Amino acid sequence: VRVDALQAQADGILNQWTASPVANLGNLAAWEAVSDEDEATAINAPNVGLRQSFDVEPLPVMATPAIYGVQLTMLARKTDAGLGKVKGLVVSGAQSAVSTDIILQEQLAWQSTLFERNPNGNVQWTEAAFNAAEFGVESA
């Protein structure tokens, strides 16, 4: 079994969250805010149901491709009072799917969710389908 960690490389088709740069960083793209490994930059959503998707790096070429699932991992926290929740998001073709609610804490913590099947047809993931899909987050 092989696990590949692939990062966002561009904003996807769903861009409802706001990138929050600090100081004079200019207009930071959402994908840059989540990929720079810096807590000073982030994305946030003021309302429930907002979606942000990202184009991720392509899978390395596989001799005998077999994808048993896609694990979406995010570093997240809540920033205001009350219950903070998000959902993992995958967009594949004209179909999308979200995970169950992920409860957030006040401190940054790694969260992950698993998409075992491609929502576009409810079929096993293929290399081509993965490379064409977008992954992200929905405010809950």
Segments from the language model and where they lie:
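Disulfide-rich extracellular domains of secreted proteins
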Residues: 1-140
